[in-house]
Amino acid sequence: LVTGVVYPLTRALFGQRLRQPLGREVVVSRGLAERLLADGAWRSDPSSATADLWVIAKAAAHDTRIAQVYLGPRTRPPPQPADVSQAVARVLGTVFQDMALHAPRWQRVRGSRPVPTFGEEHLPGEPNPPPAPGPLVSAFGLGWQDLRALWGAVLPPQTMLALQRVPRDPPEAFRMPDAVWARVVYDFAVGWHMKIMDREQLLRSMTPLYLGWVASFVNEVGGLGRPETEARVERLCEAFEAEKPYLISRWRWPDRFTP
């Protein structure tokens, strides 16, 4: 979720290249802490798993100086399939809420700039093996079969057609273009903002689309080293930035804007 959605989306929104917006460890200045305490939003769910993302969004939206520090690899168990839909709904719900809160700010931001980085990156000795693309593509196909009508209420016809044309056989040939994925994320953000349906239902319905993107990414970076993989992530982020005018237009004029 961080690589495919949270990082490229928050980078395009707020213009700061913070690689791990869900880094979990956050250090704040006294001034920022006072501003955060004055904001009553955190009191509604102070133990939220996405509280760190809320802090970072508040800082980025108010031009607070931000830096990132390498703390070393963290071993975490891979998410179970049953948890993916819940994670998508929880994380994207927080991101989309931050988008709504700070819309006047991010609509003025263009491009992005590097964030000061300290420390040395230490890669894990044995990274988790990538998931097999077959089950991911199958999940996307089932989503297309069962949720196509719902997706059509969120996505414009051009995007639906682009998704339909993505090859699924063999699974290793599955590729989701960066611009299409960026527009999918942006359109779901607009749909959440406009409350076109139950928000939880909308967010969970995005899971097969996300799994399709994961399959595409795995197919592209499988066998690549860390530098080449990060270069691929950079191209994805550039696509999100290039498609930001589309997001702004949809956000401002959701009813009369024709993609």
What are these regions, as identified by a protein language model?
Residues 43, 54-72:
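Catalytic donor-sugar/metal-binding loop of nucleotide-sugar-dependent glycosyltransferases
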